[in-house]
Amino acid sequence: VSAYSDYFFNLFNSELIVGYIVAMVGMLFASASVLTFTSSSSSLREPAEVEEIAEKATDSKKDGNILTLLLVLNHFTMVVIMSATPLHVQDIGETVELVGVIISYHTLGMFLLSPILGNYVDKYGYKNFTYVGTSILFISCLTTFINSGPLALKIGLYLLGLGWNFNYVAISAAISKFSIKFKTPLNIRSDSYVFLGSFTAHTTLGLSYLVIGYRGLVSVGMLVSIYLFLNLKKLKKLDID
C-alpha cells in the first residue's frame, strides 16, 4: 500500500482503505472456508462414541465456550489495536512509511517465538502461558495508553503481537486437546469465530475509532486483558493437560 499510496489516495481518497478492505474480505473468506471445507467425515465432527465421554463433554461444554471466548477476544483485541494504529499514526502527523515499520515490529512479536512456543505449552500447560500472554497484552495496551508516540508504538505493538502469540498458541492447543478428548468440533467453530471476529473488528473500526479514539481502544484492550486473566480461573476443572 505504501508503494502506491498516491494512486490509492487519488482513487479512494485514502491510501489505507485498500489494506482494510483486503483484510476484511480475507477474514470473511477464511471463516467461511473453515466451515465449508472441513470434511464431514472428520473425527472432529463425529459424535462421542462412549456414553461416559458424552456426559463429560456435556459437563465441559461451558469450559469449551470459555476457551472459545478467550481465543476470540484475544484475537479481536489484537486486530482492533493493530488496525487502528495506522489511523493514529496519520493523526499524529507521521507518514505511512512509519506504519510499515511499526507493523514490522508487531509481526516480529506475533511470530518470532512461534516455532518453539508450542513445545513449551505442551510441557508446562496452556494456562501458565495464557497468564503470561494476558499480562504482556495488558502491558502493551498500558504502554500505548501512556505514550502513543512513534517509539512507544513500536514497543507497544511488538508486545501486542507477543502477547497475542502466547495466548493464541496456548488457547488453541487447549481447544485442540478438548476437541480430540470429547470428539467435538470446537476447534472448527473457534477458528470460524476468530475470523468472524476479525471481520467485525475491521468493519466497526472506523466508527469505534471516531467515537472513542486510539486511547479509548487501548483502554478497552486493558479491560479485555483483565477479563481474560480472571476467566482463566474458571477453567481449573478442565482436565486436558
Describe each model-derived feature in a short phrase.
Residues 61-81, 158:
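Pair of pore-lining "gating" transmembrane helices in MFS-fold secondary transporters
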Residues 6, 113-125, 209:
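Helix-to-loop junctions at the C-terminal end of transmembrane segments
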Residues 166-179:
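Intracellular juxtamembrane helix-capping segments at the cytosolic ends
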Residues 128-143, 222:
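Structural signature of the two symmetry-related core transmembrane helices
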Residues 83-99:
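Short amphipathic helix-loop junctions that connect adjacent transmembrane helices
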Residues 1-35:
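Helix-loop-helix hairpin linking two adjacent transmembrane segments in secondary transporters
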Residues 140, 151-159:
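Paired small-residue
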Residues 182-211:
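A late C-terminal transmembrane helix in Major Facilitator Superfamily
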